[in-house]
Amino acid sequence: MRDAEQSFTRIEAIRKANSDPSYVNDRIYRLMYKEDLYIAAYEKIKSKPGNMTPGQDGTTLDEFSIRTIRNIINKMKDESFTFRGARRVLIPKANGKTRPLSVAPPTDKVVQEVIRSILEAIYEPTFSKNSHGFRAGKSCHTALKQVRESWSGVTWVIEGDIKGCFDNISHSKLIDQLRLRIKDERFINLIRKALNAGYFENGAFFSATLGTPQGSIISPILANVFLDQLDRKVEQLIKDHHQGEEGDKITDPAYRKLQRQKTSLRKKAEKQEGAERDATLSLAREANSKLLSMSPYLTRNNGFIRVKYVRYADDWIIGVNGPKLLAEELRSVVGEFLENAGLELSIEKTHIRHAKSETAKFLGTNLRIGSENSKIMKVLRNGKKFPKRVAGWTPVMYAPMNELIAKLHSRGFCDPKGNPTTVNKWIFLDDNQIVEQIGSVWRGIMNYYSFIDQFSMLSRIQFILQHAAAKTLATKHRSSRSKIFSKHGANLRVRIRDKAGNVIRQVEFPLIKSWKTSPKRFKIGTVDTNFLERSLRLRTRSKLYSPCVICESGDRVAMHHVRHIRKMGQEIKGFKRVLVSLNRKQIPVCHECHLKIHQGKYDGISLKDFALPHTAAA
């Protein structure tokens, strides 16, 4: 255990040293010899969805053992370890296109997790606070929270999208970026091997010359390392264009004059008719167009300017409190910078939106800065509250209702107009499973959009899914929606009983009781920042050193894995029933017992027959 602590202490020392962005790391390849880093890596990924999906070689994490780790380390020592080609599958996207996903062999995944933990120790301390994708303690919600809290006053929003970002990252440019902080060619070459591993698609092998493989464990952090240069570039632009101070900000007289002119023209048009009215409204629209291209404020040096920036993976937005010309200039500068890095702005997705009159989109959320109408707010002066008319320049966020309904339609919950439908693919499930499945879809949507303004907009989505669940139950039982609600209530409560008829559990559709808007209701979890303690915990709980829990033999012990311990609509049979009773997806077994499990010879065994039942249950 002391050796384990030394391994993790070294990683923690690397993390602390790299709080200095100029620090250069050397002799880190030797960490790839540390058995305990592989054990912690295995423990971290062993139960994640997809890790029982076979790679191209047909292997899974089943039969993973200490011997597997030691074989990897021996290959690391003579530098003969190679990453095998991943199996590529195409995943459908909402727009009808597909995105590639790579399924790597299990040993490759464990090695990648070790590499990822080392790269995280090197780069995480100095990653930008504006970068939120694939980082501990960061998420879509932290990115949107940053916009909510710091984007007041923004007049223009640049929606940024990098065309095929993950697929087009230059390997040579990425390696050059890594070499700025890593002076260890053996470690660099190991990463190069991972990048060059290629993939199999429909049985044919394709070499990889560009991009980080999607679905790879190290792909997200490598993308963040590469895009960190974009973060630094934009942050320099933020400093370069920082102009004026808050106390210097005054309203531009020309802006106020044009504003009064627009208001006067609209009032005049209300009293007119026909062609005369149309001509006046045309002048009002012309005045409004000029207003949209102007900043409302001046400073002593004739211009108050602020630039904001947030990035999540390859999605980013820039906010400009200043003229549209500056927004256009920034888009051009960023596009040129990305081109020099070997990437390309997606022209069809990179828009400049007026923050008040147009809607920008970021991370599935519609974004505007305030509204066009002024409102009365209470301000505090000398301890007393006074009413003040303000223009409303704070960020406002909404759910994209039309897109959500279209997505629900594509998944069979409603028709194109949002009318609930029977979910035919689930009518063969148990009643509680139908309510749980459809309820989980609704729970995911309401949790993601918990922070939006006008939260009650989501009542439409709740209605669709609540009634889709009721219609599915009605179809299954050849009944009607009204009878289902009469029997189970509005929340579709289903009671689950044991063989004696006793209620052991009940399931309900998660209905919202209060539609009160809470703009600060972001779902942000706590972060376990103690790497040493967390890693030792993973290492300590590992059963990779344990004997066989069935017969207590120490001969060729490996982990027996199952893909699921519970799966809706399927009866649990055979040896899997033991794992269900243990609530475990992996147990250590010797080679002989492992063969018997797969041959079905232990299908009738129970936990009391195990030589080490407590180890199995731990």
UniProtKB/Swiss-Prot annotation:
Protein name: Putative nicotine oxidoreductase
Domain of life (superkingdom): Bacteria
Organism of this sequence: Pseudomonas putida (strain DSM 28022 / S16)
Keywords for the protein's UniProt record, in alphabetical order: Magnesium, Metal-binding, NAD, Oxidoreductase
Alphabetical GO biological process terms: homing of group II introns; mRNA processing
Cofactor(s) listed in the protein's UniProt record: FMN
Record's note on what induces expression: Expression in nicotine culture is about 5 times as in glycerol culture.
Binding, Mg(2+): 161, 314-315
UniProt similarity note: In the N-terminal section; belongs to the bacterial reverse transcriptase family.
GO molecular function ontology, one term from the record: RNA-directed DNA polymerase activity
SUPFAM superfamilies per UniProt: DNA/RNA polymerases
